Amino acid sequence: MASIPATVAAVAQANMVAPFTGLKANAAFPVTKKVNDFSTLPSNGGRVQCMKVWPPLGKKKYXTLSYLPNLTEAQLAKEVDYLLRNKWVPCLEFELEHGFVYRENARSPGYYDGRYWTMWKLPMFGCTDSVQVMKELQECKKEYPQAWIRIIGFDNVRQVQCISFIASKPDXF
């Protein structure tokens, strides 16, 4: 049973809004029919050189960029420059036994892979130059020549890790 005030309110609302009459004709949206002409697309002249990626068998994947060949010192410095430009705090970590995904401390699937890496010194708060990070990397490599070493960039405002990549691997990996 509907009450009288509800009926009156419904009638008043219906009078305030015009009824929907459907979509208007396409005259308001002019459309030109284009012919698919691929002759004007940019081209590199057929000189494509693709980078060879990591072989799918016999090599373990580590983390970001691990499918690429080892990064040179200059390439590592560019990555560090990138994280510094983004105002992230660089930090080095190393692992002596398991540089690849190894579920020892957590068995659940997902982002967290169960590894704990040892931090090399403290995060480099106030670091403004990739040369400083590269010197620390060389120091860590000298101390632990058979370790996996990664460089991490932390955002200290959001308190999250934003970048992580392998900077050094043991021989034979």
UniProtKB/Swiss-Prot annotation:
Q: Which GO terms describe its biological process?
A: photorespiration; reductive pentose-phosphate cycle
- Which protein, by its recorded name, is this? Ribulose bisphosphate carboxylase small subunit, chloroplastic 6
Drop me one GO molecular function for this one.
ribulose-bisphosphate carboxylase activity
Q: What family does the database annotate?
A: Belongs to the RuBisCO small chain family.
Its organism's taxonomic lineage begins at: Eukaryota, Viridiplantae, Streptophyta, Embryophyta, Tracheophyta
Q: What does this protein do?
A: RuBisCO catalyzes two reactions: the carboxylation of D-ribulose 1,5-bisphosphate, the primary event in carbon dioxide fixation, as well as the oxidative fragmentation of the pentose substrate. Both reactions occur simultaneously and in competition at the same active site. Although the small subunit is not catalytic it is essential for maximal activity.
Q: What other remark does the UniProt record contain for this protein?
A: The basic functional RuBisCO is composed of a large chain homodimer in a 'head-to-tail' conformation. In form I RuBisCO this homodimer is arranged in a barrel-like tetramer with the small subunits forming a tetrameric 'cap' on each end of the 'barrel'.
Which species expresses this protein natively?
A: Flaveria pringlei
- Subunit structure, as described in the record: Heterohexadecamer of 8 large and 8 small subunits.
Specify the superkingdom.
Eukaryota
Targeting signal (transit peptide) range: 1-50
Q: Key word Cytoplasm present in the record?
A: no
